[in-house]
Amino acid sequence: MQPENVNANFVLADKIARVVYAETFAKSLRVVEALTSMIFNQSKQNVESIIDIISDYKQFESLCDNSARHNLLDVDSNNREFQMCFRVAMRMLHGNLPDMCNRATKFHRDEFLPKWATARGYVADIDGLLFYQ
């Protein structure tokens, strides 16, 4: 792998990990792997770049300035739970993360019910996140 690719993967993994951390609080490895898998599944299905997906404030509440989760995006990179998110993101970028969310491409927290979810059945419920195909 070229040095510039290593650096690009590091930067992208950091961005993915920050969003995953803010959305999951890194409650468990299972939920971190599931949300990271969902991001990858969405990139395969919609042919969107991962950076476009993790920049979508309509999908990730933490990206909204007025979200209570927004400040979690600034987590210290030495934080243990963030490091877990970072390692999972690197596994995904290197093709070493199996699908941990049953091919899901959407999610929401169990305290919300978006309109798009009312006509669908969820395929996984992991630590308060519901995943959909």
Q: Where do the model's predicted regions map?
A:
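Bacterial extracytoplasmic/cell-wall-associated proteins, especially those involved in peptidoglycan
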Residues: 2-133
